[in-house]
């Protein structure tokens, strides 16, 4: 399986994402600069965290116009796994690949620490290796992680089981309905504020994020490997 880590000007979690795939999964991975217009050679697309284009205007607001976004939308339409983490989630929202928007944390501060999450849906290509309702610990690092959508959209997310992760116990940023991560209706585009790539080895303080990447590989192998 071949992963692409998309790098925008201002990305700063791309190396973490790369090593999570290369070192912990043992899968092929390449950095892809934001000006490419084709991602056909890749099986999964990863949008890492950071401050794309300095987060001017809004987080992700300029990155949505990058050349690579056309290729990302095409990959999403083809059903390939697309994962946006932190700033990557914000970019997916700005690009319309996921519903809703991000606001500043209700504390008006940057928050960087481990946080508890509950797995609300383990039937996606990103969460099959988790137990339903499993509580995991994943780091967060953001100043604009306060997810918001209108009431109609929230009810659709609930009805369609698109809410994948919710903050457990403490809501660190004021996010609506404790939402930490959602998928699109098709289930192949996941956006989440916590950083699973920073939780893939016990030496990093925990490995709860590794199952997310293992889930992607499991999905791909089940879909593409022919058993004889």
From Swiss-Prot:
The gene is purQ. GO terms for biological process: 'de novo' IMP biosynthetic process. It comes from Anoxybacillus flavithermus (strain DSM 21510 / WK1). GO terms for molecular function: ATP binding; glutaminase activity; phosphoribosylformylglycinamidine synthase activity. Pathway: Purine metabolism; IMP biosynthesis via de novo pathway; 5-amino-1-(5-phospho-D-ribosyl)imidazole from N(2)-formyl-N(1)-(5-phospho-D-ribosyl)glycinamide: step 1/2. Its EC number is 6.3.5.3, 3.5.1.2. The keyword Acetylation does not apply. Part of the phosphoribosylformylglycinamidine synthase complex involved in the purines biosynthetic pathway. Catalyzes the ATP-dependent conversion of formylglycinamide ribonucleotide (FGAR) and glutamine to yield formylglycinamidine ribonucleotide (FGAM) and glutamate. The FGAM synthase complex is composed of three subunits. PurQ produces an ammonia molecule by converting glutamine to glutamate. PurL transfers the ammonia molecule to FGAR to form FGAM in an ATP-dependent manner. One of its GO terms (cellular component) is cytoplasm. This is Phosphoribosylformylglycinamidine synthase subunit PurQ. Its main location: cytoplasm. Residues 3-226 form the Glutamine amidotransferase type-1 domain. The active site is at residues 86, 195, 197.
């Amino acid at each position: 399986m071949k992963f692409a880590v998309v790098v925008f000007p201002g990305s700063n979690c791309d190396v973490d994402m790369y090593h999570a795939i290369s070192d912990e999964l043992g899968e092929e991975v390449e950095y892809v600069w934001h000006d490419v217009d084709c991602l056909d050679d890749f099986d999964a697309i990863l949008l890492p965290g950071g401050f794309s284009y300095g987060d001017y205007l809004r987080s992700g607001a300029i990155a949505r116009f990058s050349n690579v976004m056309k290729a990302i939308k095409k990959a999403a339409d083809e059903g390939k796994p697309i994962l946006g983490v932190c700033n990557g989630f914000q970019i997916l929202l700005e690009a319309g690949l996921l519903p809703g928007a991000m606001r500043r944390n209700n504390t008006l501060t940057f928050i960087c620490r481990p946080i508890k999450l509950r797995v609300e849906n383990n039937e996606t290509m990103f969460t099959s290796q988790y137990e339903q309702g499993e509580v995991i610990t994943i780091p967060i690092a953001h100043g604009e992680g306060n997810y918001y959508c209108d009431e109609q959209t929230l009810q659709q997310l609930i009805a369609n089981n698109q809410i994948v992760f919710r903050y457990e116990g403490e809501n660190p940023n004021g996010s609506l309905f404790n939402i930490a991560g959602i998928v699109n209706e098709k289930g192949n585009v996941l956006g989440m504020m916590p950083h699973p790539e920073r939780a893939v080895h016990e030496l990093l303080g925990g490995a709860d994020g590794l199952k997310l990447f293992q889930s992607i590989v499991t999905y791909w192998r089940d879909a593409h490997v022919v058993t004889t």
